[in-house]
Amino acid sequence: MGIRERLSGNEAVATAMKQINPDVVAAFPITPSTEIPQYFSTFVSNGAVDTEFVAVESEHSAMSACIGAQSAGARAMTATSANGLSLMWEMIYIASSLRLPIVMSLVNRAVSGPLNIHNDHSDAMGVRDARMDYAIFRK
């Protein structure tokens, strides 16, 4: 097998998640973050991690599952983007008020009507005051 020179951002996040080996990952696919749970689920199915992967019916449920897992003492992660984050807003404020250290990978995308997949920070700015402690933006 040849040397791989680079990873996409989503592959890099999934690889970092593999190294973390969280207890629970709950995610619902939304463009452009879909590849994160997709790549990570291959690590789960191949036995590279012993994470409980929860495929949920919505982003609201993804954050709810992370809140439940983290409240029980598990390390929980999720990934989302744009309108998916908007659907999580209610639960993000609950997670923040409970001071739960949930890791969420947010792949920035414009929040708007159908088919806007261009990059901006309107999704992150919508929840910036939720007191999720750290935000790292990378080009």
Predicted features along the sequence, with ranges:
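Thiamine diphosphate
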Residues: M1-G126
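Flexible, glycine/proline-enriched loop segments at strand-loop-helix junctions
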Residues: D133-K139
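Small/polar-residue-rich loop-to-helix segments that shape phosphate-bearing ligand pockets
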Residues: V111, A130-D133
